[in-house]
Swiss-Prot record:
GO terms (BP aspect): bacterial-type flagellum assembly; protein targeting
Family note: Belongs to the FliR/MopE/SpaR family.
Membrane topology: Multi-pass membrane protein
Gene Ontology CC, one term: bacterial-type flagellum basal body
Protein name: Flagellar biosynthetic protein FliR
Length: 258
């Protein structure tokens, strides 16, 4: 018969508790996992299952759970999980920004959906591109790659005896700027064409003021914008795959080795 004293029981619970905090923090901000369609009980259950599979292979944590250093260690696990999840979320933030820019140029900024996650209105173009990116994300099994990265982080960023490097935020800021730049390059052709149409409409208004620019310009921008989106989608799929590959490479080779 197995017997446990109180110290052994607290040690067992704490060794399971530390990885669960990091995984649960990651699920709270990571793409797909942070969706409200996945309720809190499912997130806690999934993070508990992953932690239960991982913690026997991790070094023993000597920090006392109910102590000052234990509280600091909890904060560090939360911060590491949020940083990893936020890095993965950069792709969808870029897609949302690209969709907002396209919708604004097409004159569809008024056509919005209420986003339950951000609690703000999202343009219909942004929502469409976000769903497309989500399909690509799931098709390439990127959610499984993200889970493996979180598990690898326990070895490159150990729970005990590791202090989070401040340089991680500067490296993340530099990488996020490159991601957003790629997103702008994706929508740049549509922006140039629609801005050219607006410029031509302004010239027509100067040459013949009796022409109703609003009755011509709005449907023209809408038709050309939808036509450009039609040609953009085949180009967007390999573009998204490249960004996702760069994202996984950055998290594996840069973020986990700081």
């Amino acid at each position: 018969m197995l017997t446990f004293n109180s110290l052994q029981l607290i040690t067992l619970i704490s060794n399971f508790f530390w990885p669960m905090i990091r995984v649960l923090s990651f699920f709270s901000v990571a793409p797909i996992f942070k969706e409200k369609l996945i309720n809190r009980k499912s997130k806690i259950l999934l993070s508990g299952m992953i932690s239960w599979l991982v913690w026997p292979f991790l070094p023993e944590v000597h920090t006392v759970l109910f102590s000052y250093f234990g509280f600091l260690l909890i904060l560090q696990q939360i911060l590491i999980g949020i940083v990893l999840g936020f890095t993965a979320q950069l792709l969808f933030a870029t897609i949302n920004l690209s969709g907002e820019i396209i919708g604004l140029q097409m004159g569809l900024s008024f056509a919005t959906f209420f986003n339950n996650n951000s609690q703000i209105g999202t343009s219909i173009i942004s929502r469409f591109l976000n769903i497309l990116a989500l399909f690509v994300f799931i098709t390439l099994n990127m959610h499984l790659y993200l889970i493996s990265i979180v598990i690898d982080s326990f070895y490159s960023m150990p729970i005990d005896g590791y202090f989070l490097n401040v340089n991680i935020f500067f490296i993340l800021l530099k990488f996020s700027s490159s991601i957003f730049l790629n997103g702008l390059l994706l929508v740049l052709p549509i922006m140039i064409i629609l801005l050219s149409i607006s410029f031509v409409m302004s010239l027509l208004n100067r040459l013949s003021p009796q022409i109703s620019i609003f009755s011509i310009g709005f449907p023209l921008n809408l038709i050309l914008g939808m036509l450009m989106l039609y040609f953009l989608i085949p180009v967007m799929l390999p573009f998204l795959k490249k960004i996702l590959d760069d994202l996984i490479f950055f998290m594996n080779n840069n973020l986990l080795h700081i």
